[in-house]
Swiss-Prot record:
Native source species: Macaca fascicularis (Crab-eating macaque)
Chief location bin: mitochondrion
This enzyme's EC code(s): 6.2.1.2
Protein's recorded name: Medium-chain acyl-CoA ligase ACSF2, mitochondrial
Residues of the transit peptide: 1-44
Keywords annotated in UniProt: Acetylation, ATP-binding, Fatty acid metabolism, Ligase, Lipid metabolism, Mitochondrion, Nucleotide-binding, Transit peptide
Length: 618
């Protein structure tokens, strides 16, 4: 057996340690001889050994590369759906309990073809952007797959967005079409759109001309006839003609797996959302690799029934949920339009669910249901918990009380399609409770000591960086911000502070920026601070995250009023309603007269956070 220097990226690591200015900078160059010596002490392994083993860090340094035993897939989403529909045509593909819809893979493929053909028939073309704005539903899954089938780029729009937030994302990517339900609960989608696009009421369907949204020409209503809109059923009917189905088949011949397929918005430190753009290649392979980590290929059809309470506009829901089910012929079960702990338990019991996806907050709510013990959860086997840090006691409760012995703790970012680290199902409870698992196949990770400018020692905190097939194409229309996030050697800087141990387990210990993760939602203080500064009584405001047993973190706005002004926390919360998403409204509003400062006058947010937690008795 020929020896090789392929041991988990050793040659790449050697080049990194050589001090390329584009990678580690000048300080790394000074450490070249030291790091090379560390590498020389590592035994070379054969290619077969590399593929058979669990990847380990190299040379006592925080660098690891996932195995490459299985080839990456060069398929579009449409080709994957076609393959699964041919392989298991009569297996249940989708169950929407709220709408009482059930489809087999053959039926889903037929509906997706009609929807994709229909979108082309109303004038949308390959590369056009279409926004999907609404809660979890059959229509969401249909549009997700239909846009991919037609080469149209899906823009995932947060269903809680208000008018200004909606306007920003639609203009940012030049959305040509927007799909939404008339309303859900108190969210009046059509009325919100009219605030920024009043022309829709008098427009001919498909021929909208908007002053503030010049790219938007087509508005599609999912469930009700509305002025200026097309009904989704009308789009499907238009796509049923042989002419348009043939047009779809023609277009599919020219789709590439490297074409963009999805834009997901993720906020930046300035508070302005950035459109992370993902390709078929990103999404197909991430869902395939995650399913492999979950060992879905070993499951029987009865064990392939996934309950998905996670939102589809999030990457975990659309990739780890919809796409992974599609890749492995698993049944996707939508328990409710938005998360509801009771509905999730009802879905598990009624549908004989075996896998469950969710954030820590969702699992806390499920476990805290007063009638939890009355549900039959005997069919549960495993699932994924991700989105924000989960305390060890919660991991143990999920495994023991929800019967999820094969639970996997996963970590990722939207920019990485999303999952880059995850446990193996057979990992111990302690390993799952104390880490986010080990590196995924075809993915590299390194932890950088930012002060020294080189790779961190094992068990030493530093910034986590990722490289591989999973890294996004870029931020839509923002090459400068893309360059700040992804360096010339294709390393993506996550902004998360992490450690790696000798076994390759990664632990997220903090964030290099002040992002708040509330129940799986990423919230950036700068965005809220800018918003509160529009209040006439506010002189200054600082927003921090404070600990919360249920949500992980809650938002605390520390407000300094202008001289002579008075107000209340209730007034401030009322000021937020209808202007920012409900999940961004601070739970705590504290009025202060000053902030903790450094000697140079900079606000010390970590000290402010500590002060607020003491003040609030958290």
């Amino acid at each position: 057996m020929r020896a090789t220097a392929a041991y988990v990226g050793m040659l790449r690591l050697g080049r990194m340690c050589a001090g390329s200015p584009g990678v580690l900078g000048a300080r790394a160059a000074l450490s070249r001889s030291w790091q090379e010596a560390r590498l020389q002490a590592v035994r070379f392994l054969s290619s077969r050994e590399v593929d058979r083993m669990v990847p380990l860090p190299v040379g006592g340094l925080s660098y690891v590369q996932g195995c490459t035993k299985n080839h990456l897939l060069s398929k579009t989403v449409g080709r994957c759906l076609e393959a699964t529909a041919q392989r298991v045509p009569e297996r249940e593909a989708l169950v929407d309990l709220h709408e009482n819809i059930r489809l087999t893979f053959a039926q889903l493929k037929e509906e997706v073809d009609k929807a994709a053909s229909g979108l082309l028939s109303i004038g949308l073309c390959k590369g056009d952007r279409l926004g999907m704005w609404g809660p979890n539903s059959y229509a969401w899954v249909l549009i997700q797959l239909a846009t991919a089938q037609a080469g149209i780029i899906l823009v995932s729009v947060n269903p809680a967005y208000q008018a200004t937030e909606l306007e920003y994302v639609l203009k940012k990517v030049g959305c040509k079409a927007l799909v939404f339900p008339k309303q859900f609960k108190t969210q009046q989608y059509y009325n919100i759109l009219k605030q920024i696009c009043p022309e829709v009421e008098n427009a001919q369907p498909g021929a909208l001309k908007s002053q503030r949204l010049p790219d938007l020409t087509t508005v599609i209503s999912v469930d009700a006839p509305l002025p200026g809109t097309l009904l989704l059923d009308e789009v499907l009917a238009a796509g049923s003609t042989q002419q348009h189905l043939e047009q779809l088949q023609h277009i599919q011949q020219f789709l590439s797996c490297h074409d963009p397929i999805n834009i997901q918005f993720t906020s930046g430190t300035t508070g302005s959302p950035k459109g992370a753009t993902l390709s078929h290649y990103n999404i197909v392979n991430n869902s395939s690799i995650l399913g492999e980590r979950l060992k879905l290929h070993e499951k029987t059809p009865e064990q392939l029934r996934m309950i998905l309470p996670s939102p589809l506009y999030h990457c975990l829901g659309s990739v780890g949920g919809t796409m992974m089910c599609l890749m492995y012929g698993a049944t996707l079960i939508l328990a409710s339009p938005v998360f509801n702990g009771k509905k999730a338990l009802e879905a598990i019991s009624r549908e004989r669910g075996s896998f469950l996806y969710g954030t820590p907050t969702m699992f806390v709510d499920i476990l805290n249901q007063p009638d939890f013990s009355s549900y039959d959860i005997s069919t549960m086997r495993g699932g994924v918990i991700a989105g924000s840090p989960a305390p060890p006691e919660l991991i143990r409760a999920i495994i023991n009380k929800i019967n999820m012995k094969d639970l996997v703790v996963a970590y990722g970012t939207t920019e990485n399609s999303p999952v880059t680290f995850a446990n193996f199902p057979e990992d111990t409870v302690e390993q799952k409770a104390e880490s986010v698992g080990r590196i995924m196949p075809h993915t590299e990770a390194r932890i950088m000591n930012m002060e020294a400018g080189m790779l961190a020692e094992l068990n030493t905190p530093g910034e986590l960086c990722i490289r591989g097939y999973c890294v996004m194409l870029g931020y839509w229309g923002e090459p400068q911000k893309t360059g700040e996030a992804v360096d010339q050697d294709k390393w993506y800087r996550t902004g998360d502070i992490a450690t790696m141990n000798e076994q390759g387990f990664c632990k997220i210990v903090g964030r290099s920026k002040d992002m708040i993760i509330r129940g799986g939602e990423n919230i950036y203080p700068a965005e809220l601070e800018d918003f509160f500064h529009t209040h006439p009584k506010v002189q200054e405001v600082q927003v921090v995250g404070v600990k919360d047993d249920r949500m992980g973190e809650e938002i605390c706005a520390c407000i300094r009023l202008k001289d002579g002004e008075e107000t209340t926390a209730e007034e401030m919360k009322a000021f937020c309603k209808g202007k920012i998403s409900h999940f961004k409204i601070p739970r705590y509003i504290v009025f202060v007269t000053n902030y903790p400062l450094t000697t140079s006058g900079k606000i010390q947010k970590f000290k402010l956070r500590e002060q607020m937690e003491r003040h609030l008795n958290l």
